[in-house]
Amino acid sequence: MAPFPDEVDVFTGPHWRMKQLVGLYSEKLSNTNFSNNRDFRSFLQSLLDTFTEFKKHEQIENECIMELLQERSHTVYHVHADNKLSDMLTLFQKGLRSVTSEFEQLNYAQQLKERLEAFTQDFIPHMKEEEEVYQPMLMEYFSYEELKAIKQQVMLQHCSSQCQSSCSDTHTLLKGLSLWSHAELQKAFKYSDHEKTGDERVLERVSVSSLPQELLLRIFRFLGPQDLCRCAQVCSVWTQVTRTGSLWRHLYPVRWARGEYYSGPPGDLDLEPDDDWIKSLQDDGRAYQEWDEDADVDESEEASAERSSISALQREKLLLNGIIQKLLPAVGSSVRSLSLAYSSTLSSKMVRQMLSLCPNLTHLDLTQTDVSDSAFDSWCALGACGTLQHLDLSGCDKITDRTLKILSVGLGDSSTPSPAHKLLQAPPSPIRIEEPRLQPMGRSCQDLIFKRRPGGRGSGCGPTHIWVLDPVKLADIEDAADWSRRGGVASQEIGCGGISEALSASCCCRRSQRRGFRTGLSSSPWQYGDALCGHSSCCSSDAAAIRTQSDLQATGGSAELRTKCWFEGQSCAEHHNRTDQSGAQRALRFLSLSGCHQITDLGLRCVCLRGGLPLLEHLNLSGCPLITGAGLQEVVSASPALNIEHFYYCDNINGPHADTASGCQNLQCGFRVCCRSGE
């Protein structure tokens, strides 16, 4: 058939080069001494380079020619599916890696000859088919100018691949070019060079690895965590750039394990998920805990779904461990947000390791996880979490007052330093909590008595009674008042040492002997006889008490509450050598303890120490039935910026801002503690 014009013949030039390479390795095959290890390995290396160029040639034809032809004609498909290039490359690599002895070389040579002859018999007709079948189809489906553009692109790609593969070795480059005759070179590059613009000729080819690290960092900022991990595998320079802290400020490993690769800053509060979704997560977590790796495989659909859930949780745990071991040691100081909400594989040890590696966290979300107090041991140092602004522990039902004590230390001390602080030495006396067995009183209740160390300052004040009601048998405030009177008598009958005498003494905050049980703000709670105030100056540790002073205004009759932290001539161990921490304002703005049913007034008082919470705007204490109105009042007094609309606590507590606060968020909630869950 008549030859096609050179301007639009897209196959002849590259095929000329491929045929030259076939002739070259055929000649070497007959001349190589396979019993000589040096000649054997040299021939295999040349074959590896040759077939790598073959594979690149086929890729260029697929991308620049065949894909375009498939778009125009649907009869063309899988043109290069069976060229066996990958199998040949694997054969050469195996020979270079595994064959060592002369006997193995001779056996391998026989196999190699058979495979090369079979490949050559297929490859030469394959190129002929492209020239005689597909070139006419290109002439039919493409215009003359389109074919010129296609050929230009094909030749540019071939030249680029040859330069990249051999530019590191000048001898190899010259040797490769010597295979081309002058006429062949002229034919191959005729329509690839003269149509370039002047700017394209001047432009030098630069490898991506030569880009400045500043530019790479700017590009990487547009990538997600999955793409960054892939870029880290390219080369050592890219690995170093991908470990830049600014690329990992916000971590969401649980979401990443589920295929959601969001890495931006945390937005507004998300809506609570529905009960069904939470239940499915809990079921998956239980299935993962009960999973037996050595058990027999169940092929049922239900078992298949369970295996899928277990596989997802395995990915989550693997990702969490990888972040702890590989990522955080390099970028932990730059991490600002860490969201681990709804993780079924998270442990307290993992959280403790993460917090120790991320000292500058501002946002921590542990919603509905199985962590305990030990997860926060790395915050025991004064100011260890001084930058923390958002802490969400919703649904963490293992959290107790110990976590709040640690949090109080970690947030730092913003109280005004005084000369007395420098003279304090002895540690404070601890608070002891006794739970005496009370006689039945018609309804189930429990009296928690906070006692002082015998001989401590302020020991003349009576103990504080905090009533813990049975959620199943709730009553109104009038019944509680009756329990208060009867509870005092019962305590005397128990005979605990010092209790009867303590009850006979008057509380330092009492101003009247009238009996009653009211905790509202319209009248001060210490105006009534047996209802003790519950303030820290009367019932908490003598080391760090919160004095609440009341100045009744002549016109309104309301109380102005002022709270300050003071030390009675003794010091906590944490207050030594902390002059650099004093005066720094605590940054906490959001605190959610929803469902943390073990939290008591003691924990709240501890958080209010060392300067209070001056910036706190959101406080959620839903599902915390052990808290009383007195404890809530102290938190409110220590949080001047608190937004009442974002203040949540149990509806059974007669606490501050009862008419304007948002109440309990856990009503009718199926996955968090609520005192009315029996309704």
Swiss-Prot record:
Molecular function in Gene Ontology: iron ion binding; iron-sulfur cluster binding
Keywords: Cytoplasm, Iron, Iron-sulfur, Leucine-rich repeat, Metal-binding, Nucleus, Repeat, Ubl conjugation, Ubl conjugation pathway
Residue sites binding Fe(3+) 1 per the record: 15, 57, 61, 130
UniProt KW Hydrolase keyword: no
The UniProt record lists the keyword Iron-sulfur: yes
Binding residues for Fe(3+) 2: 58, 61, 80, 126, 130
InterPro entries xrefs: F-box-like_dom_sf (IPR036047), F-box_dom (IPR001810), Hemerythrin-like (IPR012312), Hr_FBXL5 (IPR045808), Leu-rich_rpt (IPR001611), Leu-rich_rpt_Cys-con_subtyp (IPR006553), LRR_dom_sf (IPR032675)
Sequence positions that bind [2Fe-2S] cluster: 650, 664, 674-675
Cofactor list: [2Fe-2S] cluster
Domain of life: Eukaryota
Residues annotated as domain F-box: 205-251
Cellular-component GO terms for this entry: nucleus; perinuclear region of cytoplasm; SCF ubiquitin ligase complex
Function (record text): Component of some SCF (SKP1-cullin-F-box) protein ligase complex that plays a central role in iron homeostasis by promoting the ubiquitination and subsequent degradation of ireb2/irp2. Upon high iron and oxygen level, it specifically recognizes and binds ireb2/irp2, promoting its ubiquitination and degradation by the proteasome.
Domain notes: The hemerythrin-like region acts as an oxygen and iron sensor by binding oxygen through a diiron metal-center. In absence of oxygen and iron, the protein is ubiquitinated and degraded.
Protein name in the entry: F-box/LRR-repeat protein 5
Lineage: Eukaryota, Metazoa, Chordata, Craniata, Vertebrata
